[in-house]
Amino acid sequence: MARMYYDEDANLDLLAGKTIAIIGYGSQGHAHALNLKDSGLNVIVGLYPGSKSVAKAEAAGLTVKSVADAANAADFIMILLPDEVQKTIYKNEIEPNLEEGNVLAFAHGFNIHFGQVVPPANVDVVMVAPKGPGHLVRRTYEGGEGVPALFAVYQDASGQARDRAMSYAKGIGGTRAGVLETTFREETETDLFGEQAVLCGGLSALIKAGFETLVEAGYQPELAYFECLHEVKLIVDLVVEGGLAKMRDSISNTAEYGDYTRGPRIVTQQTKAEMQKILSEIQSGQFAREFVLENQSGKPGFTAMRRKESEHKIEEVGKDLRAMFSWLKKA
């Protein structure tokens, strides 16, 4: 069984007196920067001139510099930008400012694993990837807890890369919950697979198919929305708390029996074969090439798919229903 590492396994002093540059101030960026700052470390934020995030970061008491200046001033550089822009910003702003002994860090292995970013041999290259959104990383830290994280070493130029990665994980609160060691390849391929086959692609397709089946059979769209989308959270919360066993222990016998007897008719061996094909496309780099080319061409297909999905009836029904949910209404 994989070993988890905790606070006592990591030494925060390894980053004491060092300057940590957080490149980007989005969901993960703001959480990492503020948690590291509250851990007593010296943090600066790298943003492009005119970024709307400059005011937010400065209001939080953080020093903001251009990406190039932040990279130049830092010992430890964490890149928390969208995958599709990392290559260009790294090449133009970060790479020219790297020095021997620096740490180049990522929260996802995509660009390193697929060769979009090729670091020099004289820097450490590590990954620290919280397994939760930024707001949760921040909120749990403030509550004295943390979000579990993955960490990995791609290149150990200093001989301390692993310890430095664990130190950073401790600084953002990850070792409070536990951190698991992996590799850039393993994190990248499993993360992409989970997103595509289960969490995003698989779940979205399942929800829409269920909704469409009920509506096409003449049932009210509002009821179809409740049964196929709204109640997903109720089930997922149980699964997260105690696995499939707790979920099944918490639902009715009718629902549990239907789970066992009908579920395998939805996710069949053919479905699993398609999952294996999707995994192969990830492993071979086919998906990465497709995604890179799509972005290089201006995202025409991506934009069209976004527009089409936004016009699905489930979005219209959901918007109207959510407007009536008192607990979702803005104060």
From Swiss-Prot:
Gene3D superfamilies: 6.10.240.10, NAD(P)-binding Rossmann-like Domain (3.40.50.720). Keywords: Amino-acid biosynthesis, Branched-chain amino acid biosynthesis, Magnesium, Metal-binding, NADP, Oxidoreductase. Mg(2+) 2 binds at D191, E227, E231. Its EC number is 1.1.1.86. The keyword Metal-binding applies. It catalyses: (2R)-2,3-dihydroxy-3-methylbutanoate + NADP(+) = (2S)-2-acetolactate + NADPH + H(+); (2R,3R)-2,3-dihydroxy-3-methylpentanoate + NADP(+) = (S)-2-ethyl-2-hydroxy-3-oxobutanoate + NADPH + H(+). GO terms for cellular component: cytosol. GO terms for molecular function: ketol-acid reductoisomerase activity; magnesium ion binding; NADP binding. Binds 2 magnesium ions per subunit. NADP(+) binds at Y25, G26, S27, Q28, S51, S53, D83, E84, V85, Q86, G134. PROSITE patterns: KARI_C, KARI_N. Belongs to the ketol-acid reductoisomerase family. This is Ketol-acid reductoisomerase (NADP(+)). The gene is ilvC.
